[in-house]
Amino acid sequence: LALHRSRQTKECHDTHDTTTEAPGDDPAAVGARMLNAEDNRLLTGVGPDTPMGRMLRGYWHPVLRSARLEADGAPVRVGLLGQKFVAFRVTHGEVGFVDEACPHRCTSLALARNEDNGLRCIFHGWKIDVTGRVVDVPTEPRACRAAFAESVPRPRYHVRESGGIVWVCLQQGQPPAFPDFEFHALPESQRETRIAVMHCNWVQAMESVLDSAHLGLLHQGQLQRAPADASMADHVRTVFGNTQQDTAPQLEVEPQGYGFREGALRQLPDGRRYVQIREFVAPYYSLLPAAPTVARRFIVASVPIDDEWTAQWFIHFSLDGPLTPELLAERWQHAPENPDNFYENPGDIGNLWGQDREAMRNGHFSGFPGRHIFHEDFIVQEAMGPI
């Protein structure tokens, strides 16, 4: 992905160098740099037997907010990389993560009883502990139950809780190093997480976050209210205003060991240049630009559920104090309150996601007034088709 984006822009080896070359406008050269159908299939296929799927299984993935799991509570279904799982918190508080299908007859363990530090299937009573090991098979003769249970093959996945999130690595054997983001060390009052589930592949979702050019176009309706909106923080108002001044930013990419650093350079009317810098951390994390004077950070992670569905995580945290109710109200204005899917019931292509043509005639660019700014992104991503 970093290579693909660097082909589209001039690689910037000196981030302080303000002289850049304009990309060529030869249509054949531009076409040669574009993603083709074969590359697209390679990137979007995330199942266990695909190249991308095998690569992604070597990473830790956020799968649930920790708050969703209660000790001895209902298991929660989780889709990740084209497979189906259930997560559960056992009696003593530890989190388990296992294949959804019971190893006996493949019925869903989302229906299982969660008790006595394990899941017990309601069909034949087989019990699976927090590590995924089968520990009881009451349908077998007592004399051989223990040996039979031990013989049942069952993959075991790596699970860790940190930063209010349940993380999972599907790789068998030794897991990789855990991602050391700043928010892991912060108290709950200084961080919050919300998730949006959308019907498009993870690459479409991820590239939208990295794409600075659309800010002054798709989000015009949001930007137009910025100068007069007293509830909007000064640095946010500045960002919105500057992105409208130049809708064709020049992109510069600097490869890094963790991914790449991307700069979007805009020319302002007074001769200054406005630069937004994003960090991309493999395999799908985008660290959004932040004002130098603000100690708040925003990470977006585009986690593949399968080839056609994505759970996009929005991790917001403050390094210098609690996230106040007022700040969160501003950040999530017009967003549904469900933190586990603030994009629920959005509509679809059948009703054009509720687009308001009257609002468009009255000057709203996208036709989605009263919607959270991220909803505009989700809608155009879904409108591309799932792949």
What are these regions (language model features)?
Residues 2-14:
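Short, Lys/Arg-enriched N-terminal segments with co-localized hydrophobic residues
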Residues 3-5, 37, 45, 253, ...:
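Generic detector of low-complexity/intrinsically disordered segments
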Residues 11-29, 48, 94, 167, ...:
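C-terminal catalytic domain of Rieske-type non-heme iron oxygenases
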Residues 21-84:
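Zn-dependent metallo-beta-lactamase
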Residues 32-45, 53-54, 77-78, 86, ...:
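Short low-complexity stretches enriched in small and charged residues
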Residues 57, 153, 160-162, 296, ...:
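A short, structural micro-pattern
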Residues 59-61, 81-83, 155, 258, ...:
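Short beta-strand or tight-loop elements
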